[in-house]
Amino acid sequence: LVSFISSLNILLFVPTLSFSHIAFNGNIADELIDRGHNVTIVLSSVDDTVKSNGTNRAEILRIDVGISNGLLTRSLWQNPGPYEDSSPLNPLILAKLLRVSSIFVKACTEIASNTPLIDYLNKKKFDVGIVEQYDYCGFGIFSTLGIPSTVWISATAVYRLQPEALGVNYPLSYVPELFAHVDDRMSLMGKLENVLVATVTEMVSTFYSSIEETKVFRRLGVLAKSETLKDVSRRSHSIVLNAMPIFDIPMPISSQIVHVGGITVNERSETQLNTDWLSIVNQPNDGFFLITFGAIAKTRDMPPSMSRSFNEAFAFFSNLTFIVKDEDVPKGMIERRGRNVVRTSWLPQMALMAHPKFRAIITHGGWSSILESIYAERPMILMPLFADHAKNSQVVRAKGVGVLIDKMRVTTTVLIDSIREITENTR
């Protein structure tokens, strides 16, 4: 028997926005490599604090795009910070989105005019280009290289402008915008909020990022005067989402939209826990909770009143253990605080979730943590902080697998009631 294998040369264009986005792109690269394809990843280094490449199996080209150290991190997570009002309707957030967009435009200008890089990539003769939803620059790079097929991906749930580029309309009357604090049963005021959030985010994406980056490629002669990067995005062959239709708000769909939710979730293995962790989780009590707010929001940055509310709520449930991700704990150390609180700078999260005494996670509504909780078959208490956390948390509440709390209204009583809801009601 003779078998024929057709290997494609595939280019992923990945700005280093955050670890979760890098991980999603890395998982896609690994899946493609497993199927015999040749994968190159161009990492546009917009954030120097993100050191991960997502994979060590693909060819990695990490490109310095002239962004000063820590600039994107400061722009994203300060003034206001993650524990403050982060609605896109907050003028400070709009200003922040515009600052971040200007960073991406600068990075795009640098990478598009990097002649040695473009010459090297041209020699690779790529068949497919893959780019994520938050930056149009990749479409310009693919046009520069003459890549015939493009795939538009999202490490989160779907961003409305993606399906709409392919002709699938998402009615704002019942489909929540990715950054909006509403579900599909919106009140009149909820619908108004949804429309306003959609207007603000689309303005930043289309009328700033897309237009400014389009100018970059027009100056280089890649795009005609009448053509925009948004036009190029409409020629995408498919959209790949890190989402699951069964765990989302009902919305229009297309055969061009592919769902791969859970691709970033590693298999559980209780044997991954060392003796120190086993001595903590195997205590003769009612189990343990995990508390983590992702890689960006630091526990130390919590307002004192919020931190005090958490500590008082933990003390109320003396027969539960609360394991808190705390960046101030020395690396590799596990510190016990009080009778039932453990703090550490790093959590073996999936291994802890696989343990039978794991009760629930208190977290920020990041999509990766939600998918891991679903995989572990455990409920959640979600306190959305920014970006897509709002919509993610609304989905969790709508599906009945978690409790949603408002970060602007956190009190000891709210936290106690939320924990009691999880421990006393089967989900």
Predicted regions and their residues:
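Glycosyltransferase specificity loop/lid
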Residues: 2-221, 228, 247, 256-288, ...
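Long, low-complexity segments enriched in small/aliphatic residues
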Residues: 232-249
